[in-house]
A protein has these predicted regions:
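Internal alpha/beta core interface subdomains
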Residues: 19-32
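Hydrophobic helix-and-loop "lid/oligomerization" segment in the mid-to-C-terminal part
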Residues: 32-148, 153-184
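Short, small-residue-biased leader/transition segments that mark boundaries at the very start
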Residues: 1-8
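Short, polar/flexible loop-turn hinges at active-site or ligand-entry regions and domain interfaces
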Residues: 12-17
């Protein structure tokens, strides 16, 4: 998204040709990619956002794009409420019921806003297997941890699924993978 802002800034497209909704769509991509300018954010990111703002992007309209509904918030908090601390600074949630993938990912993100949490893992039942969503502030490489369970991603955002396994079995494997990660 920052790259698209650069395209406009380098005037490959005339500023007068950019619609407000286009500038807002690009700005919303930056907000999403950087998790509200807190992750992978540098000077070029802020420059692109400022440029899009000058093109007419309304930050309040962008914020409204990300508003959820009450039921979604309650679902996230129901997940967060079940979090257990592992190794003092890793939040782990193991749900025995099915869950929406987006809700699980948002809950994993939100767990990182709690003081002292360096990484979060949300495991939930899906059919005869388990889906996993993991987040980190960067100090813990969640990709490496989830690779041990067949997942992938990057150091701060990872996910995966394991078939023919219970949530309890997946949680045990996750805790083992976390221990192995910290032993190395």
């Amino acid at each position: 998204s920052r790259g698209l802002g650069d395209v406009y800034k380098r005037q490959l497209v005339e500023p007068s040709d950019v619609l407000k909704c286009e500038a807002e769509a690009l700005l919303s991509g930056i907000v999403l990619d950087t998790k509200n300018f807190t992750n992978r954010t540098g000077g070029r990111t802020f420059e692109a956002a400022a440029y899009l703002r000058r093109l007419g992007a309304d930050t309040q309209d962008v914020q409204r794009m990300f508003q959820g509904d009450l039921n979604s918030m309650i679902a996230r908090y129901d997940i967060i409420r079940q979090a257990e601390l592992y190794r003092d600074d890793i939040a782990v949630v193991a749900l025995d019921e099915e869950c929406d993938r987006v809700t699980a990912a948002k809950a994993a993100d939100e767990l990182l806003t709690l003081k002292g949490i360096r990484a979060s893992f949300v495991l939930y039942k899906k059919g005869d297997g388990v889906y996993m969503s993991a987040r980190s502030l960067g100090e813990v490489n969640v990709q490496v941890i989830l690779e041990a369970l067949g997942g992938g991603g990057n150091s701060t955002t990872a996910g995966g699924q394991a078939d023919n396994i219970t949530v309890a079995e997946a949680k045990a494997k996750l805790l083992e993978a976390i221990d192995k990660y910290f032993e190395n």
